[in-house]
Amino acid sequence: MMDDKDLEAEIHPLKNEDKKSQENLGNLPKTEDNLKNKPVPSRLSRCRTVAFFLSLFICLFVVFVLSFIIPCPDRPSSEDKWRLDYDYAVTYDFLALGDVDRDEVQDVLFLYKNTNSSNNSTRSCADEGFSTPCTFMAAVSGTNGTVLWERPLAQDVAHVKCAVPQTRDSKVSSACVLVGRLGSFMAVNFFTGETLWSHPRSFSGNASILSPLLQVPDIDGDGAPDLLMLSREGQEVSGALYSGSTGYQIGHRGSLGVDGDGVALLHVTRTGAQYILLPCASALCGVSVKGLYKRITGRDDHFKEDPSWENMLNRSAHRRLLHSSGAVRYLMNVPGKTGQDLLLVSSEDCKLLDGQDLVPRWTLGATQVLRKPILGHYKPDTLAVVIENGTSLDRQILLLDLSTGSMLWSQPLPSLPGAPPSTSLMTADHRSAFFFWGLHDPVSANEMDPQDTQHSLYMFHPTLPGILLELANVSANIVAFDAVLFEPSRHAAYVLLTGPASSDVPGLVSLTKHRVRDLVPGSRVIHLSEGSSDSDQAIRDRFSRLRYRSEV
């Protein structure tokens, strides 16, 4: 039988709920006390939350706007190839590179001599006071080959040095400094071609200039490196210093006391002393910049001398630093372990000299070096020197380890006299791609007129030591050549300047650019040794995949 309480609960189900509600009401004050004890979110906390979400929304909105609404700035689209022609002109063995129009693509500067002013120039030879023909300088866009600026600069040019480095805080523009054959000495703005300064030469018209113009640290405190010009008259070599920003002579001319007859080099010893090095027949002569500066200004507050070098020079009657086994032909500074070393090429041998004590590190004997060596990387981050040994059909390309002189690679590659120099470009694997010029058909070269012989451009990479890639064939007379990284890590190309072989016979002058990667698919694969299992197309694909990087 059902209990009375259960029966009542079944008949009046809400009655118990009312009792529970009353019990809960009785406990309400305690609950409210507990709620009052709980922390209530402050206004500052709410403001922080609102600020956070507002900032997040703004950031997302900005990202959206930058990504989808505002277009990216137009990047100049570099053409794979272009060509610029000048009729009835002659040109010079000179190419300079730099970003003239500041579009992050390298541009090309060159010289040509023309009777008529170009359509790209607003000034003629007569406007600048020259008779026709006169020498023009032109800056050409590396992007598409358009002329950025062009103007007549001299009656004829003997020497030119472009893009003189300036300090960051200097107000002096980078410049091209030109020395004319008939007495002019001037500098023009690298970016606009406008004249920065112009003066007559300070030495006799019978004197010949010893190239190149040497650059010395700032003497007159104007923030620009200054210039040292050496000239030879008779048996005497003299030098003069000029301000890099104004062109005015600093002091007077002074004799070096040597009978040098070749290209001068400025060398820095381990102590930081600067010396002018000159080939003197079968010897190497040296003069301290400090000593020359003291002679021409009467002051000795700039530069320093190296005691050990002064001892070597004082022991010689004619300021000879060392004697060579043959006539000194080329001299160049190369990176050493603790500073600059010297690579000396004579008519008998090639040797690397320690940059401080001039002791040979290695010697390559019985050489007949065709032209000034170049540097590259055969192994990753390890410098190699490229030597073109022999002449004409007997020429060999030698790659030597710069630090030890050991042979890394060699290959016969016949050429004709006057062929363009070799060059190299660093690749992404920290090696170098090397570019050599040679004869397309050495067998028939002896039977052909040199003017009808084709020069071939060959490409070599150390990862494929048994392969040469023939990229192009050129029958025109090549005046200047260089391989250039026009955009960092984007594309490499070669620049070719062709023109008449004689400056007395005007003709067609052409400046051309060709992208290396676009030449690879149509190239000819030359196997130097047996055993390569890759097909020619696979080899071309490997060359096409090469990526290039800047040296610095």
UniProtKB/Swiss-Prot annotation:
Its main location: membrane. The chain crosses the membrane at residues 50-70. Residues 71-552 are extracellular. This is Protein FAM234A. It is a single-pass type II membrane protein. Residues 1-49 are cytoplasmic. InterPro entries: FAM234 (IPR045232), FAM234A_B_beta-prop (IPR055409), Quinoprotein_ADH-like_sf (IPR011047). SUPFAM superfamilies: Quinoprotein alcohol dehydrogenase-like. It is found in: Membrane. It comes from the Eukaryota. It comes from Rattus norvegicus. Keywords: Glycoprotein, Membrane, Phosphoprotein, Signal-anchor, Transmembrane, Transmembrane helix. Residues 8-22 have a biased composition (Basic and acidic residues). The modification Phosphoserine is found at residue 21. Glycans are attached at residues 116, 119, 314, 473. One of its GO terms (cellular component) is cell surface. Belongs to the FAM234 family. PANTHER family: PROTEIN FAM234A, PTHR21419. Residues 1-40 are annotated as: Disordered.
